[in-house]
């Protein structure tokens, strides 16, 4: 399916690991984020309850959405965490999963500008949020990705 946006659309990514709740909100506000898309497989945090999906939904209100269509498959994530597959293999499997799911089919493309893909990892380098952002940019022309 072909998707189109007008002008240059910016999408952001953020990982909450190592960020206080105040810092997290300050970063989102400074970037003028329109909506946080939580793309974690499980939207709970044992270590930092502030980042549980229900808490984020209360704090962010209509600026929070849970998008399971961008979450990794449980088996792929488990195999990577258990070191059964390398990052390169994880990346390949996750990209194939996105192609199969076509996660943009149920998203309001006109509201993509200034969304922020949320996950746990501090760095986007080895996190599926980077891959999800790249997937969106491959599907839609004129997308700029910014990692917060």
Regions found by a protein language model. Give the residues of each.
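Residues lining hydrophobic/aromatic ligand-binding pockets adjacent to catalytic sites
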Residues: 2-148
């Amino acid at each position: 399916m072909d998707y189109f946006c007008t002008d240059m659309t910016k999408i952001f990514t953020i990982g909450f690991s190592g960020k206080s709740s105040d810092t997290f909100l300050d970063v989102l506000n400074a970037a003028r984020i329109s909506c946080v898309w939580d793309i974690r497989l499980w939207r709970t945090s044992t270590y930092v309850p502030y980042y549980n999906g229900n808490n984020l939904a209360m704090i962010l209100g209509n600026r929070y959405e849970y998008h399971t269509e961008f979450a990794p498959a449980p088996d792929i994530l488990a195999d990577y965490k258990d070191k059964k597959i390398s990052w390169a293999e994880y990346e390949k499997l996750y990209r194939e999963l996105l192609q199969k799911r076509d996660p943009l089919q149920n998203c309001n493309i006109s509201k993509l500008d200034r969304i922020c893909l949320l996950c746990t990892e501090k760095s986007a380098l080895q996190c599926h949020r980077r891959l999800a952002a790249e997937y969106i940019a491959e599907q839609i022309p004129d997308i700029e990705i910014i990692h917060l």
